Structure formats: structure tokens, C-alpha cells
């Protein structure tokens, strides 16, 4: 179950506050969403909102194509920023140095993948990597993790899906496989009229 916490992001310095409380918020699984060199602030904001709604952690690998304090980022994330744990890294090596476990249970979203995402088996705490909007993930990174590359099926004429849409699709597929831990599964509607 979701527990209320006080957690805020200082958009200027991008510091994390009250991390211990944040980590106690979920009793279930947590996904790690990694954006490698994202370029479009609105996508980052939308993805932050998806992370807030699902209890996923957001990891941003520099260089970023925007300032994290950009109004477009904040606006797209609405008032959900207090629900998101966000970390930044200088590069992929920095991320793997801080989180060596990421290499063991990662999935790389790429249009060049040999398998579609339905073949992936997602686990508690797995890491989902997404590349920048114009070029995707670096080729050497994809080749190193070739067996962990997955693709969202689409028409041959389409180059790719929007980054924030791709993140949402894979995040919810992973959570579906895990049984939607910690998420509210039903809404409350007015009674159906006779």
C-alpha cells in the first residue's frame, strides 16, 4: 500500500530529500527507469509522472538536453514531483558504479532489438533503459547487452514511438507481470443508473 510521505525535489540543485521515508513508501517491487541522455523536457516530465503513478525510480544519465528546472519538465510532471525519487549520473559508467546490480537485471528498449517486449521476464527491481529521442541507446551498450534488448512492435514505416509512450508501455508490462505491487487496482465510480 502507498504510504504518505514528505518528499520534494529541489529543481535548481536537483537534491534528494527524505530518501529513507521515500524508500519505505512501497511494500512491493520497485522498477528502475533509466533515461540515457534524454533531449526533450516534456518527455522527461511525462515519464516522471508515470514513475510517480507506479512507484518507479527515475534515473537520468547525462548529458541532458534540458535543464531539469525547465518549466516544461515541471509542467509535464504536474504536481507529482514529490512522489518521484530521481537520481542523476554523469554517464552510464557512473550509474553502473553506483548500482552494479543494474547490469544483472536490465532490459534495453530499442527499435533494433531482435525480440519483442512480450518475451521479456521482468523481475522485482529490474532496470529498464531507454535512449535519447533522436538516436536511441549507444550501440556499444546495446551490443554488450544484446540478449537483453527488447522492442515494441510497430509498422515498418514508423521509425519509433514517442519516448514517454514507450516508457509507459514497458513499465506497465513489467508491473503487470509482477502483479501491480503497491498499486490501487480499482477506482470508485458513482452507481450505474437504472
Predicted regions and their residues:
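Post-transcriptional modification and biogenesis factors for structured RNAs
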Residues: 2, 6-194
Amino acid at each position: 500500500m502507498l504510504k504518505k510521505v514528505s518528499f520534494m525535489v529541489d529543481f535548481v540543485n536537483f537534491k534528494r530529500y527524505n530518501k529513507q521515508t521515500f524508500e519505505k513508501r512501497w511494500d512491493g517491487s520497485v522498477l528502475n527507469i533509466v533515461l540515457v541522455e534524454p533531449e526533450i523536457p516534456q518527455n522527461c516530465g511525462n515519464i516522471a509522472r508515470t514513475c510517480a503513478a507506479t512507484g518507479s525510480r527515475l534515473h537520468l544519465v547525462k548529458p541532458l538536453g534540458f535543464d531539469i528546472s525547465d518549466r516544461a519538465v515541471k509542467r509535464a510532471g504536474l504536481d507529482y514531483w514529490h512522489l518521484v525519487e530521481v537520481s542523476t549520473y554523469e554517464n552510464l559508467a557512473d550509474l553502473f558504479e553506483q548500482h552494479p546490480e543494474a547490469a544483472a537485471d536490465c532490459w534495453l528498449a530499442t527499435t533494433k532489438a531482435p525480440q519483442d517486449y512480450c518475451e521479456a521476464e521482468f523481475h522485482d527491481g529490474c532496470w529498464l533503459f531507454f535512449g535519447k529521442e533522436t538516436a536511441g541507446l549507444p550501440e556499444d551498450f546495446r551490443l554488450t547487452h544484446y540478449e537483453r534488448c527488447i522492442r515494441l512492435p510497430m509498422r515498418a514505416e514508423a521509425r519509433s514511438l514517442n519516448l514517454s509512450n514507450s516508457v509507459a508501455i514497458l513499465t506497465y508490462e513489467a508491473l503487470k507481470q509482477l502483479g501491480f505491487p503497491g498499486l490501487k487496482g480499482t477506482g470508485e465510480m458513482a452507481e450505474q443508473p437504472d
